[in-house]
Design a protein with these regions (language model features):
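Internal helix-turn-beta structural module
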Residues: 155-211
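Short alpha-helical "patches" and their helix-cap loops
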Residues: 1-7, 105, 207-211
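Short, mixed-charge aromatic SLiMs
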Residues: 6-17, 111-113, 170-175
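Glycine-rich anion/phosphate-binding loop at the beta-strand->alpha-helix junction
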Residues: 54-172
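Generic detection of long, well-ordered alpha-helical segments
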Residues: 38, 79, 192-195
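Glycine-rich, mobile lid/loop segments that gate access to catalytic sites or pores
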Residues: 1-77
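N-terminal, helix-rich and Lys/Arg-enriched segments in bacterial and organellar proteins
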Residues: 21-24, 82, 130-133, 138, ...
């Protein structure tokens, strides 16, 4: 499942890193503006409209969660699951960054805070008490939900006058872009990010016919 996690400085509720229900994923797919919080979604929509009327654009973040991936899918080093997902995700226009699990927040954590402790639940499944690793350890799935976020830059094609150069004459100039351009590509990117995750994970699972 995938949702708009952030537009400009407005943030949606994040996925629960330990458990994402099928019902939640289906509900997001039936929304015209896929956010967990409808109130935040409306605020994002209004902010995009304000940027449009201001002849400007906005960036944002898409969060994706993949559930029911068995432990052991992937490979270490260069053929890791994170590598494969990131490679396809960066093929989506306007992508500028990706993070898995706790992402860049781990830089401010202690090892004792970042480490996800393992345990066996009542039905014998091996799980972790937290999911800072985002469902992938050493390039291989752990059995926990795979969670990652993708940052998209604001659309560069805006109607405001901007400084540029005339390459033919090597002189400075001004450009004003005409026509219809999206003030924010993030809503359109939601199914693209989900498809990228599906392709990357399926390609790894095909290497394991027993799955």
């Amino acid at each position: 499942g995938t949702h708009i996690a952030q537009i400009h400085n407005i943030k949606d509720t994040k996925f629960n890193p330990l458990e994402i229900s099928r019902e939640q994923i289906i509900a997001l797919r039936h929304k015209k503006f896929p956010t967990i919080s409808d109130k935040k979604g409306q605020a994002m929509y209004d902010d995009i409209d304000l940027a449009r009327r201001s002849l400007d654009s906005l960036g944002g973040i898409v969060e994706c969660a993949v559930t029911n991936v068995p432990a052991g899918v992937g490979s270490p080093i260069f053929e890791g699951l994170e590598n494969s997902i990131a490679q396809i995700v960066f093929g989506i226009p306007a992508v500028k960054g990706i993070e898995f699990g706790a992402g860049f927040q781990v830089a401010s954590m202690l090892g004792s805070q970042n480490n996800d402790e393992f345990y066996v639940n009542e039905v014998g499944h091996v799980l972790t008490k937290t999911n800072n690793h985002g469902g992938i350890l050493g390039g291989i799935s752990s059995g926990m939900p795979i969670i990652f976020r993708v940052a998209f830059k604001p659309t560069p094609s805006i109607a405001q006058p901007q400084q540029t150069i005339d390459y033919g004459n090597l002189t400075n100039g001004v450009i004003e872009i005409k026509g219809r351009h999206d003030p924010c590509v993030v809503p359109r990117a939601v199914p693209c990010v989900e498809a990228a995750a599906n392709i990357a994970i399926l390609s790894h699972m095909l290497d394991y016919p027993n799955f």
